[in-house]
């Protein structure tokens, strides 16, 4: 089948929930992907910050193939070696003691909300405006963007939103029924919004003073994206609960709720569960992925390459009237422009660079952490060209 036929079949048989780019991808390697016509692209989107170790990493591919020949699924009625090995590894690299396995970031956030309510006996969850936590009914309600939740009313009760970065507003919002505060360390879908210095530490202190749990949604920031294994380490905070997914499995769908011992023990058999969560196949992929992150020092590389990427963007786009801001942490970068950025995405793709437009006016750049300097240079040249033409 050619691209035109595949696109037509998608329109005919698949529910139209996505606005897709008009290319059909075939394969990838490192930070490069190819479409079925043979065109190559520098991937600065990484499947929404998923392919952090690059496409088709041989160690992860081997782990997936090997595990598929042994045991793909068993359910959580039985023990498996791969699941406990991954749980032990996650507690070793995070500030947490116990793990619940899920299949996605939304599932992880659902689990975190349930755990917080069970542990505290309270119902209210405070989230930030402009946030994104998932598309299930609870997580889309926690999400601080009405465009995602309005079509699905009535929504679950017990959620409140305050401006991101405003500690005074957060303090005013905390009350007797507040179970938890859930925040992204850096808002991704909201436009790559970095919190003011000290904000997350102030929220942590506020939560502790009021016996409120702090949940950090590290679905997008986790596993090296910001220049540290977890963004909480970068900002010097220790949340009660952390949610992860995206980059965790190297492309295989897997997520997790990480929690401190005293909080985690609130869950009892039957309180929560998942048929596929923590299956041996996904756990094998995640173990291999995390080992690659550590062995190749990819968090440190993200810090170095992110600094280089930001510097090159600021150099090339200096004085460009269309650019309002260039910001980022590690390899999580946003270019805010004066106007809609969908046209920039199209123009960059036609010149061989894949990027994303979020929050309407922010070009989001989240490439694989293995991206090379020469690939960054090529991507910056393209972005400089298409943005300067605005």
From Swiss-Prot:
Pathway terms, separated by semicolons: Amino-acid biosynthesis; L-arginine biosynthesis; N(2)-acetyl-L-ornithine from L-glutamate: step 4/4
Pfam entry (one): Aminotran_3
Residues at which pyridoxal 5'-phosphate binds: 105-106, 132, 217-220, 275
GO MF annotation terms: identical protein binding; N2-acetyl-L-ornithine:2-oxoglutarate 5-aminotransferase activity; pyridoxal phosphate binding
Keyword presence, Oxidoreductase: no
Cofactor needs: pyridoxal 5'-phosphate
Enzyme Commission code(s) on record: 2.6.1.11
Cofactor note: Binds 1 pyridoxal phosphate per subunit.
Any one of the GO BP annotations: L-arginine biosynthetic process
N6-(pyridoxal phosphate)lysine: residues carrying this PTM: 246
Assembly notes: Homodimer.
Note: May also have succinyldiaminopimelate aminotransferase activity, thus carrying out the corresponding step in lysine biosynthesis.
Family (UniProt): Belongs to the class-III pyridoxal-phosphate-dependent aminotransferase family. ArgD subfamily.
Name of the protein in question: Acetylornithine aminotransferase
Source organism: Methanothermobacter thermautotrophicus (strain ATCC 29096 / DSM 1053 / JCM 10044 / NBRC 100330 / Delta H)
């Amino acid at each position: 089948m050619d691209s035109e036929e595949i696109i037509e079949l998608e329109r005919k048989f698949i529910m139209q929930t996505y606005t897709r780019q008009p290319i059909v991808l075939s394969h990838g390697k490192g930070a490069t992907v190819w479409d079925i016509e043979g065109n190559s692209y520098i991937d600065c989107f990484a499947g929404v910050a998923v392919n952090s170790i690059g496409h088709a990493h041989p160690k992860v591919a081997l782990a997936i193939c090997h595990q598929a020949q042994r045991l793909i699924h068993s359910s959580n009625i039985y023990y498996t070696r791969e699941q406990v090995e991954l749980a032990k590894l996650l507690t070793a690299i995070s500030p947490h003691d116990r793990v619940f396995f899920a299949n996605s970031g939304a599932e992880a956030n659902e689990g975190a909300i349930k755990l917080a309510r069970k542990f505290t006996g309270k119902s209210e969850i405070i989230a930030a405006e402009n946030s994104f936590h998932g598309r299930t009914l609870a997580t889309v309600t926690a999400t601080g963007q009405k465009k995602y939740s309005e079509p699905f009313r009535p929504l679950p009760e017990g959620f409140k939103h305050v401006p991101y970065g405003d500690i005074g507003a957060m303090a005013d919002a905390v009350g007797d029924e507040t179970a938890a505060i859930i925040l992204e360390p850096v808002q991704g879908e909201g436009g790559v919004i970095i919190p003011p210095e000290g904000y997350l530490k102030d929220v942590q202190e506020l939560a502790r003073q009021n016996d409120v749990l702090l949940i950090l949604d590290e679905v997008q920031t986790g596993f090296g994206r910001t220049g540290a294994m977890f963004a909480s380490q970068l900002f010097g905070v220790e949340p009660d609960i952390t949610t992860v997914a995206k980059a965790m499995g190297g492309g295989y769908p897997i997520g997790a709720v990480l929690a401190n011992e005293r909080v985690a023990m609130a869950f009892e058999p039957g309180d929560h569960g998942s048929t596929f969560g923590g299956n041996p196949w996904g756990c094998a992929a995640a173990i291999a992925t995390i080992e690659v992150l550590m062995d190749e020092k990819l968090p440190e590389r993200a810090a170095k390459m992110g600094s280089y990427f930001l510097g090159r963007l600021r150099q090339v786009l200096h004085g460009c009237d269309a650019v309002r801001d260039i910001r980022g942490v590690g390899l999580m970068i946003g270019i805010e422009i004066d106007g809609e950025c969908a046209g920039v995405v199209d123009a960059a793709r036609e010149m061989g660079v894949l990027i994303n437009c979020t929050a309407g006016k922010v070009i989001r750049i989240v490439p694989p952490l293995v991206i090379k300097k020469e690939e960054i240079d090529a991507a910056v040249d393209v972005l400089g060209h298409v943005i300067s033409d605005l």
